[in-house]
Design a protein with these regions (language model features):
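Chalcogenol-based redox active-site neighborhoods
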Residues: 1-212
Length: 212
């Protein structure tokens, strides 16, 4: 299949998970979503990743974002592995894990990379907006665990810039100044950004984060 691109509608699917059968779009509802794959159950990096996500679920909820994991292992394997995650990561896994034994979802989302492995998924991440469109894609090799602080930062940026005519600069964090979109003329800035702004260059104008 063709590669999924930013702005594409995230493919819908039905799948078995550790929390029952879901229809993906229905499960998302009006929420944002993070779909992320891991190569295999009972592996070290994946164990730390899912433990971290479990601890971060409250932060995702603050952002109206649901998380769901996937690997090509079976349901019983997932359930047994969850016990290890809870024990070793001092957490309680509180989100569904898809059992994609037939690789249907992995194929749909192009998570199988033959140059890495044709049997296991790479570490893919898809951030999906409330409109069911793909907002972000990331792919990590099996050897490198993901940074979920960065994922939260990106969701903050995506949600902010979806509602205001701004963009977020390098290394931006929630609460810091943002840049005004180049399409906004100087004459409109006082009305749109009443907190004020700093004019650095005609194309580089900063303003305090508008929703803070």
């Amino acid at each position: 299949m063709s590669t999924l691109r930013l702005g594409d509608i995230a493919p819908d699917f039905q799948a078995e998970t550790t929390e029952g059968t879901i229809k993906f779009h229905e499960w998302l509802g009006d929420s944002w979503g993070v779909l992320f794959s891991h190569p295999a159950d009972f592996t070290p990096v994946c164990t730390t990743e899912l433990g971290t996500v479990a601890n971060y679920v409250p932060e995702f909820k603050k952002r109206n974002t649901k998380v769901i994991a996937l690997s090509v292992d079976g349901l019983e394997s997932h359930k047994e592995w969850i016990k290890d995650i809870n024990e070793t990561q001092n957490t309680t896994v509180n989100f569904p894990i898809i059992a994609d034994e037939d690789k249907k979802v992995a194929t749909l989302y192009d998570m199988l990379h033959p140059n890495a492995s044709d049997k296991f998924t790479v570490r893919s991440v898809f951030v999906i907006g409330a409109d069911k469109k793909i907002k972000l894609t990331l792919t990590y090799p099996a050897s490198t665990g993901r940074n979920f602080d960065e994922l939260l930062r990106v969701i903050d940026s995506l949600q902010l810039t979806a509602n205001y005519s701004v963009a977020t600069p390098a290394n931006w964090k929630d609460g810091e100044d943002v840049v005004i979109a180049p399409a906004i003329p100087d004459s409109d800035i006082p009305e749109k950004f009443p907190k004020g702004h700093t004019h650095i260059k005609p194309y580089l104008r900063t303003t305090p984060q508008p929703n803070k």
